[in-house]
Amino acid sequence: MKNLLYLKDEQIKEFIQLLFYAYRETFSDPKEVLSKKFFGPAHLRALNLIEGNPGINLGELIFKLKVTKQSLNRVLRDLIKSKMIKQIKDHNDTRKKNLFLDKEGKIFFETVYNTQKKRIFNALKNSSSDSVIKFKDVLKKIVNGR
């Protein structure tokens, strides 16, 4: 059996630090674009999830972001006021509101995405396809807690 050196504490600590730095750099790339709208990281996280899950309701968004309703309300108010997102009442349950990117939000998100895309694209382009597939698999396992 192989000696699993990558499972030693020092290696795991290094992976955690690298994940932190990768997150920090990727999410700081659009800082200038966000600041023009007076948005911050919380706005970006909400926009990312709404863009990737059109029609997500408030409860699902709270669950995915792992935040309180109170902390999310300010962010959503900002995004609605600036016409980035819109709320549409659910057809089956009118108490629920589904969230979508509005036209302005789609344009803004694309601008933000393009600032982040460069870093990710270059990293993927400079890696083998096998490495990319394995890395994606590891990330999914981290997200799913396996």
Labelled PLM ranges:
Residues 1-8, 129-146:
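C-terminal regulatory/oligomerization modules of transcriptional regulators
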Residues 27, 77-136:
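Charged, amphipathic alpha-helical coiled-coil/dimerization segments
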Residues 28-68:
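N-terminal helix-turn-helix DNA-binding core of bacterial DNA-binding proteins
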Residues 1-37, 84:
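N-terminal leader segment of winged-helix/HTH proteins
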Residues 11, 39, 50, 101, ...:
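Residue-level marker of regulatory loop/turn positions in helix-turn-helix DNA-binding domains and
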Residues 50-53, 114, 142:
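Short helix-capping/turn signature of helix-turn-helix
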